[in-house]
A protein has these predicted regions:
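Short, Lys/Arg-enriched segments at the junction into DNA-binding effector domains
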Residues: 117-126
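Short hydrophobic beta-strand segments
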Residues: 1-15
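Conserved phosphotransfer microenvironments
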Residues: 11-19, 28, 33-88
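C-terminal output helix
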Residues: 103-112, 116
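As written
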Residues: 91-96
Length: 126
């Protein structure tokens, strides 16, 4: 079981992360949430994987991804995007992997497991 930090600009006080990303809520991972701002950096200290919600605000998602990258945090970043958002995604975002917003729990879980296994080794998926 991994500890996931869900970072989203749709997370207001009291809104649970599984409300924003329902497929993640069906998994057995520990879920925590943070707003898509600099406070997410502090919250990331207790996480194994950071899940960034880029479905509705790509510019802010890119800023958050780059903020994590520039801060030196080496945790895997999993970016959730719409199919239309793929056109904007490129290497300078600093994400470890992406997933489309319509993906089900099995795909989320597989990607999380792969990110954790690559983070434990030399960066290659084992």
């Amino acid at each position: 079981m991994a500890s996931l930090l869900v970072v989203s600009n749709q997370l207001a006080d009291g809104v649970r992360p599984e409300t924003v990303l329902p497929a993640v809520g069906l998994l057995s991972h520990e879920l925590r949430s943070a707003p898509a701002d600099t406070s997410a950096l502090t919250e990331s200290a207790k996480a194994d994987v950071i899940v960034i919600d880029g479905r509705t605000d790509l510019a802010n998602a890119r800023m958050i991804c780059r903020l994590f990258l520039s801060s030196g945090i080496t945790l895997p970043l999993l970016l959730v995007v719409t199919e239309g958002g793929l056109a904007a995604l490129n290497g300078d975002w600093g994400v470890s992997d992406f997933i489309l917003d319509g993906a089900g729990p099995a795909e989320f879980d597989a990607r999380i497991r792969l990110l954790l296994s690559s983070n434990d080794s030399d960066g290659l998926i084992q």
